Design a protein with these regions (language model features):
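N-terminal leader/targeting segments
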Residues: 3, 26, 35-38
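Leucine-biased recognition of intrinsically disordered, low-complexity hydrophobic segments
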Residues: 3, 19, 29-31
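Low-complexity, intrinsically disordered tandem-repeat tracts enriched in small/polar residues
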Residues: 9, 19-22
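Aromatic (phenylalanine/tyrosine) cluster motif
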Residues: 11-12, 27-28
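Glyoxalase I/VOC metalloenzyme domain signal
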Residues: 23-25, 128
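Charge-rich, low-complexity N-terminal segments
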Residues: 31-52, 57, 63-71, 76-107, ...
């Protein structure tokens, strides 16, 4: 099947990326795939967020601590490409964010359900999202919260 062939090549051949920009695998150099860490306390999360521009402490739908950022792109296609690249990254890390698309805007929210809050992996994936956003057509003036 075409879909199966694409799926296999996208996840096992790290030189293949179905979306524009560098291969998604380029963002895994420092990512500890499948290594969930312990939940961080709120003070540690707030301190770590100072190194991530535009990310904020939030709550998910079940009121667990989370981190989120609202990105603004140059077009709907750029926003959707970003979401695709985040999805590939999340699948590879076996850790999935909440994504909400509103035309040229994408809200990304990370939390670790199994740990009941934010972990170091969430923070690392947030930093990866920032890199993916730049490569996907992020507006010069990011409309972060």
């Amino acid at each position: 099947m075409i879909l199966q062939s694409w799926h296999e090549s996208a996840f096992f051949d790290t030189s293949v990326s179905p979306l524009a920009g560098p291969p998604v695998a380029a963002y895994f150099l420092n990512l500890r795939v499948n290594q969930m860490s312990s939940r961080l306390d709120e003070t540690a999360v707030i301190a770590a967020l100072k190194t991530l521009q535009g990310w904020q402490l939030a709550r998910d739908d079940e009121q667990r601590p989370a981190i989120e950022k609202d990105y603004s792109f140059t077009s709907f296609n750029a926003a959707f490409a970003f979401m695709g690249r985040v999805a590939l990254t999340a699948e590879r890390a076996n850790h999935h964010p909440e994504l909400l698309n509103r035309y040229r805007r994408v809200l990304v929210r990370w939390t670790s359900h199994s740990e009941g809050g934010v972990t170091a992996l969430d923070l690392e994936l947030a930093a990866t999202c920032d890199k993916l956003a730049i490569d996907s057509g992020l507006k010069a003036q990011d409309s972060s919260k």
